[in-house]
Amino acid sequence: MDIVSLAWAALMVVFSFSLSLVVWGRSGL
């Protein structure tokens, strides 16, 4: 496994997770 692709995958996971947390906070959950 390439370290660059692994870093990109981790970045996308963190980004989508934080984005969903922001959406949850805005909707009042």
Swiss-Prot record:
GO terms for biological process: cytochrome complex assembly; photosynthesis. Its main location: plastid. It is found in: Plastid, Chloroplast thylakoid membrane. SUPFAM superfamilies: PetN subunit of the cytochrome b6f complex. Belongs to the PetN family. Component of the cytochrome b6-f complex, which mediates electron transfer between photosystem II (PSII) and photosystem I (PSI), cyclic electron flow around PSI, and state transitions. This is Cytochrome b6-f complex subunit 8. It comes from Glycine max (Soybean). The lineage of its organism: Eukaryota, Viridiplantae, Streptophyta, Embryophyta, Tracheophyta. The gene is petN.
